[in-house]
Amino acid sequence: PEGAMKEAIASMTLLNRKAAEISHHYEIHACTDVTGFGFLGHLSEMINEEISAEIDSISIPVIRGAIHCAEEFLLTAAAQRNRNHVGDRVEFSSWIPFSMEELLFDPQTSGGLLFAVKPEQAGTFLKELQGAGGNGRQVRIQKRKRHLCKIGENER
């Protein structure tokens, strides 16, 4: 689609410096850059056996054209390795398309930062990141359920 390449380049060249600077004002429990293990691979490294994550699929930022590429099976071998590594610990709601699943396993060379923030500070931290031009979204962490991570759509 028109503008997809420009959007991808802008995303890949956005430095994580501002987000890192903002994070110094909050109680951060963990942080990782989302790179070769994809979003779900890195998330799985940040949480332990006592907790799980719940992600609202609508809130996941996706570059224009990425879903279409995945629908056309323009997939990477690394995404398949990531799926093989953590896929059995992820539960996707039945309405999540395969293309979105693939994007969450897809390795990124510059996928931004994933922070674990004290719950009471999460909203303020997110607003500050977004106010600085960031593309922050929230992942809900809860007591461990059946899977490491559930991808779905929260009720609106």
Describe each region flagged by the PLM.
Residues 1-156:
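Helix-biased detector of long, well-ordered alpha-helical tracts
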